[in-house]
């Protein structure tokens, strides 16, 4: 008789495997990114380092907020989440990756000057650039591997692609736009948010109306993507809870009545996979 093989905790039943969502919404300051993030369904924790959380509060968001003033605060938030047996949130929002990158650079240069007082805190050397690029990539990967849905926000930048055409991307510096492209590759949805005045027919007449437009599939010069292929190309005045529900419906092949019920099912799977997640997280810590 064959001896039963004891499987490592990293191997689980397919029915217990939960694929969490990783989204990125980018746009100009004041376009409403944080307001939309604050309207995510379920229990939301915003890791906030920009003032957009005030606007989210005014719109009635019930999200919790963890103030991120320095890179070390972000590391502390990650460490806390990674070491929980069960994360008590449905979504973690990092607002924004653009500002987090600035805080990462400041953290690196503070340490550089402590070790070498003759160095200028405002002039990174080549090795310092490599360090913050790798630290940013590690940070994004680590948060995205947590057993929870994650939404990032970012400001926008314009770069020139290899054909000489403009491309609008999340503002993440490094190697022209290679680091920004790498971050986008880690996401299931990359969407661009902008405030626009468009012509629409209202009561039989064409009028100019203000809309908040979310571009969710590539529309040159804007880079965007929807891995689920269910969100369309553009969404005016988006309701992010409805967009999340579309994705959940596409996963099951039928409407899901309540996100909360799905969260409860995920909680059971999370308990069974906590050991595996913690092992992976410990190997790939945010470097602080």
Feature annotation, model-predicted:
Residues 44-46, 150, 190-192:
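Short, well-ordered beta-strand core segments
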Residues 2-14, 269, 280-288:
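Extended acidic low-complexity intrinsically disordered regions
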Residues 33, 257-287:
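Intrinsically disordered, polybasic Lys/Arg-rich low-complexity tracts
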Residues 80-84, 103, 153, 186, ...:
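Conserved, well-folded catalytic cores of nucleic-acid-processing
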Residues 158-270:
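Conserved GTP-binding G-domain of TRAFAC-class P-loop NTPases and closely related GTPase folds
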Residues 97-182:
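P-loop NTPase motor core
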Residues 87, 146, 185:
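Structured loop/turn residues at beta-strand edges in well-structured enzyme cores
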Residues 4-103:
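Conserved P-loop
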């Amino acid at each position: 008789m064959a001896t039963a093989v004891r499987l490592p905790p990293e191997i689980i039943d397919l029915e217990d495997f939960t694929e969490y969502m990783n989204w990125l919404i980018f746009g100009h300051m004041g376009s409403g990114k944080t307001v939309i993030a604050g309207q995510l369904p379920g229990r939301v924790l915003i890791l906030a380092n920009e003032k957009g959380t005030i606007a989210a509060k005014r719109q009635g968001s019930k999200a919790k907020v963890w103030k991120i003033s320095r890179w070390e605060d972000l590391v502390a938030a990650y460490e806390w989440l990674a070491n929980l047996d069960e994360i008590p949130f449905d979504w973690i929002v990092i607002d924004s990756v653009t500002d987090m990158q600035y805080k990462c650079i400041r953290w690196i240069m503070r340490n550089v000057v402590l070790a070498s007082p003759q160095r200028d805190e405002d002039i990174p050397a080549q090795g310092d650039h490599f360090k913050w690029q790798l630290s940013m990539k590690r940070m994004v990967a680590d948060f995205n591997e947590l057993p929870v849905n994650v939404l990032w926000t970012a400001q926008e930048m314009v770069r020139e692609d290899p054909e000489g055409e403009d491309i609008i991307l999340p503002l993440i510096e490094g190697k022209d736009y290679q680091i920004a492209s790498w971050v986008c590759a880690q996401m299931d949805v990359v969407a661009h948010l902008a405030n626009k005045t468009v012509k629409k027919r209202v009561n039989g007449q064409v009028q100019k109306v203000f809309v908040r437009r979310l571009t969710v599939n590539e529309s040159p010069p804007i880079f965007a993507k929807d891995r689920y292929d269910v969100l369309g190309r553009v969404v005016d005045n988006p309701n992010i809870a409805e967009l999340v529900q579309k994705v959940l419906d596409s996963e099951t092949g039928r409407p899901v009545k309540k996100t909360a019920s799905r969260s409860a099912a995920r909680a059971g799977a999370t308990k069974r996979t906590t050991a595996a997640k913690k092992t992976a997280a410990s190997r790939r810590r945010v470097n602080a």
